[in-house]
Amino acid sequence: HAIGIDVSAFNALIGNCKVMKYGLVDVQTEISRITKALKEFLANSHTLEFEEKLLQALYDFNNKYFPVPDYKYKRKQGEINEDEYGTEKEKDFLPIFNKLVKEYNIKLRQDKTDTFLDKWYSQNIRDEIQLVFAEIKKIKNIATKKIISIILSRTIRSCRATTHADLATLVEPITATYYCSKHGKICKPLFSILKWWGTYTKDTLARLYQFDKLRTQTFQFCLTGDSRTIDIFGEIEKRNLLFAELAQRQKIKGIFSSPPYVGLIDYHEQHAYAYDLYGFERKDELEIGPLYKGQGRESKQSYIQGISEVLNNCKKYLVDDYDIFLVANDKYNMYPIIAENAGMQIVKQYKRPVLNRTEKDKGAYSETIFHMREVSNG
């Protein structure tokens, strides 16, 4: 059994969709219907034809000027100045790109940049997103509608107009071909969601089928709320009486969480596209240690207080001999203070390397798993 708490409504939706029960035939049927509508929409535009021509032009150009493995070897040996050479070749390819854009009448930018969806998506992609979203609205089954909404959100997260090197930390929207330091060649932004939509529909269905076979007869639910003040059992009672009775009788064995670290991430902003599209209410002001507040002395104090309040609130719902595991790269050494504030002691620390990072920065990075327990009076 598990209870999650998240201040972000969208994150709670993701969590709940992972464990929800579905009519998988209905999910497959609706995916097929929407994919057909998307392909029909694309057949009436020149987007795919444009992309095909562009990919061929890029293939020829990159083979000539960024041959594998010669280019990467020369770059490593310092025989090529990557910044100068990359910028020069980026400029050389631009006329080819612009000619194709004109030929196929591709609209690179939207008319306004008011919202995240306006700014970070080309007009073609925005039109496709709106089409799929309109089709999702027609779905009758609520569970099916939710999981396909998540598939669309995964798709649009992968289709933002950014360079491959800046996927994790958006810098400026990209509307043309560019030299890509991550791949060592000229790359392009996306002009259609079709590829990623296809990837994520297949991936999600495979995960749902697999999880259905592994599922146990247990309860899981992710609540939307502020962990510092939420009445966990009261909120569960509103949604599932059986689960609430079980939780109140047995209490909670422990916590496993990876809280955002101070000044590292704006939690709601990382999913701004979903808040724009689905209209969820944002609660940015309730975030603990957001990026926009920085890492100054006041921010650290506020973070320590916030995490301490979470632990003190949640303790009320735990068994006496609880175990808490918190994951953090605690470079400011705040967790010993947090543990003390919550009447806990750190009984063990586990070091964990962080692999498979999205960004170009692949530097060594490790986190600590803090194992905390109630301070013993003996």
Model-assigned labels for residue ranges:
Residues H1, G15, I148, K315, ...:
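S-adenosyl-L-methionine
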Residues L94-I255, V262:
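SAM-dependent nucleic-acid methyltransferase catalytic core
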Residues L13-Y121, E128, V132-E135, F280-K293:
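Conserved phosphoryl-transfer catalytic core
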Residues H1-A43, K182-D231, G254-K283, D321, ...:
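Conserved S-adenosyl-L-methionine
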Residues I147, D321-D323:
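Short glycine-centered segments of the SAM/dcSAM-binding site in methyltransferase folds
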Residues F116-W120, R297-Y303, I324-D330:
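Acceptor-substrate binding/catalytic loop of class I
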Residues N329-G378:
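Class I S-adenosyl-L-methionine
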Residues I230-I255, P260-D320:
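SAM-dependent methyltransferase catalytic-core segment centered on the flexible catalytic loop
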